[in-house]
């Protein structure tokens, strides 16, 4: 805003001219009152400028968070910047396979509604109800310990897909309640906000459209998203650079909405698209598991740069070794008992995973639990 322009003709008096039919008359009018009015204008302009400057600074600060751009990954010091400093130009290669140059990857920074997917919309509306109307069961002062956010793997805790009950997943519900429902004997209270098939852009849209409302209070938010960002084998899969940037964008959105709240970033669960036994790696060929390892390594490094982020490594939960499959890394595989389709956990897989989550929550919440837990 420019300061008020004061006339250069600022002498002690000014001339007002009247032009009736009679001869022209010149009247000398003192300017003292006009000067006082201009001084008042100056004060008003200065005050307005200071107000707008302060307001702009406050609004700008709201969108500044601690982060690091893709180009700056690997630095040991925190960098103050904006999420807008994430640039698509930082992505060196969009496709998973190095020899593939064309793949249909969505913009990892752009929130996206799954238009035309009626059941997805209904599932989102159901999540809004859960997020806004979650009520403590024992005490009006008790807040949630953990809120799980993600895709079908997260939604599986509820035994549903797109909010619809799935019979073969009901054993998962029993596992969840035994660990994350204090009324059912669980050590902590948890809430699940996941939707099957979601990519990072879909979860970002959900978060920006009400799934983390102000009234939703939780000591910890637990994030698992990104495996669907790779796309399915044979569909020109997207690279780990694309996947990591999408997850990073969500993390920064959550840090903005919940500053000083602990956010646990769950590493991507292992998945197999190599062999019938659930093998993870293949000689002379880049697999999705290779990309998952790269994404998880970057997520861990990113979390180490932020005080309110914790990285959770899931690799040891679902992976076993069979020397008959090969040596070293080629002996690793996902047993069917833990992941029937080598992507989604079985009830046993959820049990093992959930018990490790409980251990992590104990570490995070140690000393923070109050009388409300009694």
Where are each of the predicted segments found?
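Alpha/beta-hydrolase-fold catalytic nucleophile elbow
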Residues: 224, 264-267
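Residue-level recognition of beta-strand->loop/alpha-helix junctions
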Residues: 192-194, 267, 313
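N-terminal secretory targeting modules
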Residues: 3-149, 153-174, 364-374
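Secondary-structure boundary/capping residues
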Residues: 212, 230, 263, 308-311, ...
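A structural motif corresponding to the C-terminal end of an alpha-helix
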Residues: 185-187, 253-263, 298-312
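Conserved SGNH/GDSL esterase-like catalytic core that processes O-acyl groups on lipids
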Residues: 102-252, 256, 272, 277, ...
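Catalytic His-Asp segment of secreted/periplasmic serine-dependent ester chemistry enzymes
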Residues: 270-374
């Amino acid at each position: 805003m420019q300061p008020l322009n004061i006339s250069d003709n600022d002498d002690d008096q000014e001339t007002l001219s009247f032009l009736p039919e009679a001869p022209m008359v010149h009247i000398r009018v003192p300017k003292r009152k006009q000067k006082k009015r201009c001084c008042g204008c100056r004060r008003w302009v200065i005050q307005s400028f200071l107000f707008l400057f302060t307001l702009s600074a406050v609004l700008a600060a709201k969108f500044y968070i601690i982060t690091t751009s893709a180009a700056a990954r690997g630095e040991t010091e925190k960098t103050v910047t904006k999420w807008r400093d994430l640039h698509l130009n930082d992505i060196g290669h969009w496709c998973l396979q190095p020899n593939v140059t064309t793949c249909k990857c969505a913009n990892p920074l752009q929130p996206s509604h799954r238009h035309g997917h009626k059941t997805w919309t209904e599932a989102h509306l159901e999540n809004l109800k859960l997020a806004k109307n979650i009520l403590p069961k024992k005490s009006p002062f008790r807040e949630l310990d953990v809120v799980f956010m993600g895709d079908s793997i997260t939604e599986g805790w509820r035994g549903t897909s797109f909010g619809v009950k799935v019979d073969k997943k009901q054993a998962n519900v029993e596992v969840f309640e035994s660990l994350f429902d204090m009324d059912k004997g669980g050590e902590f209270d948890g809430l699940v906000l996941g939707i099957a098939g979601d990519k990072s852009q879909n979860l970002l849209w959900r978060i920006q459209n009400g799934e983390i409302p102000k009234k939703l209070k939780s000591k910890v938010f637990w994030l698992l998203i990104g495996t669907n960002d790779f796309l399915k084998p044979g569909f020109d899969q997207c690279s780990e650079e694309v996947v990591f940037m999408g997850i990073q964008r969500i993390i920064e959105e959550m840090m903005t909405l919940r500053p000083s709240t602990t956010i646990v970033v769950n590493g991507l669960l292992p998945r197999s698209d190599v062999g019938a036994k659930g093998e993870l790696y293949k000689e002379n060929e880049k697999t999705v598991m290779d990309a998952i390892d790269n994404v998880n390594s970057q997520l861990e490094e990113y979390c180490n740069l932020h005080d309110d982020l914790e990285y959770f490594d899931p690799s040891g939960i679902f992976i076993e070794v069979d020397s008959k499959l090969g040596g070293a890394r080629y002996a690793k595989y996902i047993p069917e008992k833990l992941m029937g389709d080598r992507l989604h956990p079985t009830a046993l897989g959820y049990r093992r995973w959930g018990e490790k989550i409980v251990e992590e929550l104990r570490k995070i919440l140690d000393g923070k639990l109050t009388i409300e837990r009694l």
